[in-house]
Every structure is written in structure tokens, then in C-alpha cells.
A protein has these predicted regions:
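Conserved catalytic-core motifs of GNAT/GCN5-like acyltransferases
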Residues: 110-112, 125-136
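Active-site acidic-Proline motif in GNAT/NAT acetyltransferases
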Residues: 79-85, 115-116
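Extreme N-terminal starter segment of soluble prokaryotic enzymes
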Residues: 1-2
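Acetyl-CoA-dependent GNAT
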Residues: 5-75, 79-81, 92, 98-102
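Short, well-ordered turn and helix-capping elements at secondary-structure junctions
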Residues: 57-59, 77, 115, 133-136
Length: 136
């Protein structure tokens, strides 16, 4: 598995991305409509998009205690056809090194997690995130 920045050539693949439970996130095709101060990241397994997330460098991060060198992780999802295979965990584990390499001006990741989203909370804890900013 690998992660990389979203490309406009991914647009068609995002149309086919299966995500029906939208209680806690937007569909990726909606999330890429506004990328001002945001970085869209896709997780790939054999060139198939299996995960998606936004790293938001805008003002919203301050709502969660972010600093100028923080990124707010939002809109994180796994395509329903690929859930329960570890792709979400792998994506989160690859993310700190990806940021170090491609966005070195940022030093921490802020999570804005709805308390009712127990699956996300568990996933973040299991991949080393805590209630404090994740230092990278």
C-alpha cells in the first residue's frame, strides 16, 4: 500500500468510491470540490483508491487547538468495498512519514473526531494517536 496526493485524474475513481454512511464525513468527491488550504490524500492498493483523507491547513484547525504548524486530519474514510482489511490503519501509519517528506513545514496532526464515531476513535488510538496533537 502507498499514499500520495490526490490528482485530477483520480476524479473518475472517486465517483466509484463506495461510501454510504455519511454521518461523520463527506464523500471524497464532495471533499475535493474545495481544496483551498487543503491537501487531499489517497491511499492506494495496486493502483485502486482504497482510502481518502484531507489534511486541512486552514483556519478550522484552530477550533481543535491547532497551531500554525499543524494540519487538521478530516474526511478520512475507507471505501466500503475495502473495509476491515487494515487499509485505514496502514494509511494512518504511513501519514507521518508522508508529511515529513512532502509537507515538512507542518509538525503535528490534529484530529477532529466526533465522540459518537467510536470506530474512528478506536482506529486513531490503535495507530498511535492520542488526545494531544500527534507530533511528527
Amino acid at each position: 500500500m502507498k499514499i500520495r496526493f490526490y490528482r485530477s485524474s483520480d476524479r473518475e475513481a472517486l465517483q466509484a468510491y463506495q461510501l454510504t454512511d455519511l454521518r461523520f464525513t463527506n464523500h471524497p468527491k464532495e471533499a475535493v470540490a474545495d481544496l483551498e488550504n487543503r491537501y487531499a490524500i489517497v491511499g492506494l492498493e495496486e493502483d485502486q483508491i482504497v482510502t481518502f483523507l484531507i489534511l486541512d491547513a486552514g483556519e478550522k484547525k484552530y477550533t481543535y487547538g491547532g497551531q500554525p504548524d499543524s494540519l487538521l486530519l478530516r474526511n478520512f474514510s475507507t471505501d466500503e468495498d475495502f473495509q476491515m482489511r487494515g487499509y485505514g490503519s496502514q494509511t494512518l501509519k504511513l501519514l507521518p512519514d508522508f508529511i515529513r517528506e512532502h509537507l515538512p513545514m507542518y509538525k503535528s496532526i490534529i484530529l477532529g473526531v466526533n465522540e459518537r464515531n467510536q470506530v474512528a476513535s478506536y482506529l486513531y488510538r490503535e495507530t498511535g494517536f492520542s488526545k494531544q496533537p500527534q507530533r511528527i
